[in-house]
Amino acid sequence: MSEAEARPTNFIRQIIDEDLENGKHSMVHTRFPPEPNGYLHIGHAKSICLNFGIAQDYKGQCNLRFDDTNPVKEDLEFVESIKRDVQWLGFQWSGEVRYSSDYFEQLHNYAVELIGKGLAYVDELSPEQIREYRGSLTSAGKNSPYRDRSVAENLELFAKMRNGEFAEGTACLRAKIDMASNFIVLRDPVIYRIKFADHHQTGNRWCIYPMYDFTHCISDALEGITHSLCTLEFQDNRRLYDWVLDNITIPVHPRQYEFSRLNLEYAIMSKRKLNLLVTEKVVEGWDDPRMLTVSGLRRRGYSAGSIREFCRRIGVTKQDNIVEMAALESCIRDDLNENAPRAMAVLDAVKVVIENLPAHHEQTICMPNHPNRPEMGTRQVPFSREIYIDRADFREEANKHYKRLVLGKEVRLRNAYVIKAERIAKDEEGNITCLFCSCDIDTLSKDPADGRKVKGVIHWVSAEHALLAEFRLYDRLFSVPNPAAAEDFLTTINPESLVIRQGFVEPGMQQALASAPYQFEREGYFCADSVYSTSNKLVFNRTVGLRDTWAKNGE
């Protein structure tokens, strides 16, 4: 991560500053604990930047720990993708990758300790009955009939659970806290359940698996985490976090702090719903460029720096808010405007014949790769008698505000000549098939000698040298600002979230590297698609337009 990226300040950093100043901690130790049941999204990027950024700024440590306590939903594919995404974002975890499953034996022993203290019991209510007995926000829960089993009986039954003598759903281990608590999370939460499923790290060695709230706090303590940072939905869970650590024999007691999660307009952050988009084939996969997964953003052409900058700009607070999509797009637009080399592409081509040039006219024009950064060099672009321009850059008639090519009037070709539209050809349906123009041969990259003013500059590619290319114009996947609020979020899919066009690019794009950014002049920022683009078939993804074209109401 660049040192030029400004160090932020927020309430968490203020807490850390106080802890270091008063000697509570001598070093900061954070962690990023994703569950490997899906790909990371932009919301996880905020947590990554917070946890790894704090460790980096305070010269501390940050662990990458996989919360792998549910083998049914987890997969090594997700483990590898998460590691790849963290590193791509510019961060490196301390030491080896860690897994909650590394601590399964210790977690089991702590569960046994709670049983021995009369603070946990084996319950044989069904999952449905447990939910019913738990009560609601307005009514207290009621005790399970199995709550007062003896320590000896609970130890025996828990051993049978571990040995696979109970079927799934017929028994679980619950913490014995308070069924009348105002906090539902403290109403005898389940801390172990039975799952007969192979685990990607431990195989079939276990058939009982600890729940997140039991695992998380103990894993933090075992790793010496000083500041356990979670999003606000875990605020009530902090009471259980502290209860577990207060009631087991463990020397370290980390503290949990909550911050607001990222809520972004026109986006879904639920892994379950993101998975549904994939399984229902609404999108191609987790790395579909319309998905706000880290891999999807990377494939679309977002840089790691732009995502870090977005996370810096939105900051870290305790108040939930909704961030406009324009804020994310602004970060990548600023990045690419500064760093992306320029090139020319025509997405909806119409041929232009410059009749006063010789039939086989060909020349090379030197163009800057960036108008404001000479250190990025130049490129040689071929120019010929026949070129392509964008269909939207010509009108037979237009008012004075239209500063492109009009029949009988002039326009400048980017870094080339001033041309004049003399006549047009149309097909039987009235569609323009060709423009016949003349050029002022003395205007190559300079103004007309007679001083006449030519307003408007358009881009072009040489028809003889142009490369056929596919352009994937991506837009927001959802058509409403808050798709999660819809009864069926799938009904809010934007039908124009992907528009595919066939066009042409200048020949230098033949060797465009996957994900390398370009500004196609007057069209937007694009990159070669990492999946479909080859030297024989060029496919470019639009990362973002040159300017924000969405009003706040999404129109």
From Swiss-Prot:
Superkingdom, taxonomy of origin: Bacteria
PROSITE patterns, A to Z: AA_TRNA_LIGASE_I
Signal peptide: none
SUPFAM superfamilies, sorted: Nucleotidylyl transferase, Ribosomal protein L25-like
Catalytic activity line of the entry: tRNA(Gln) + L-glutamine + ATP = L-glutaminyl-tRNA(Gln) + AMP + diphosphate
Record-linked InterPro entries: aa-tRNA-synth_I_CS, Gln-tRNA-synth, Gln/Glu-tRNA_Ligase, Gln_tRNA_ligase_bac, Glu/Gln-tRNA-synth, Glu/Gln-tRNA-synth_Ib_cat-dom, Glu/Gln-tRNA-synth_Ib_codon-bd, Glu_tRNA_lig_a-bdl
Keyword set, alphabetical order: Aminoacyl-tRNA synthetase, ATP-binding, Cytoplasm, Ligase, Nucleotide-binding, Protein biosynthesis
Gene Ontology MF, one: ATP binding
Main location as per UniProt: cytoplasm
Gene3D superfamilies assigned: Glutamyl-trna Synthetase, Domain 2 (1.10.1160.10), Glutamyl-tRNA Synthetase, Domain 3 (3.90.800.10), HUPs (3.40.50.620), Ribosomal Protein L25, Chain P (2.40.240.10)
Motif residue range(s): 'KMSKS' region: 268-272
Binding site for L-glutamine: 67, 212
Binding site for ATP: 35-37, 41-47, 231, 261-262, 269-271
Top-tier EC class: ligase
Assigned EC number: 6.1.1.18
Single GO biological process annotation from the record: glutaminyl-tRNA aminoacylation
Subcellular location: Cytoplasm
GO CC aspect terms: cytosol
Pfam families: tRNA-synt_1c (PF00749), tRNA-synt_1c_C (PF03950), tRNA-synt_1c_C2 (PF20974)
Motif 'HIGH' region location, chain numbering: 34-44
Record text on subunit structure and interactions: Monomer.
HAMAP family: Gln_tRNA_synth (MF_00126)
Family recorded in the similarity comment: Belongs to the class-I aminoacyl-tRNA synthetase family.
Protein name in the entry: Glutamine--tRNA ligase
Organism: Erwinia tasmaniensis (strain DSM 17950 / CFBP 7177 / CIP 109463 / NCPPB 4357 / Et1/99)
Gene: glnS
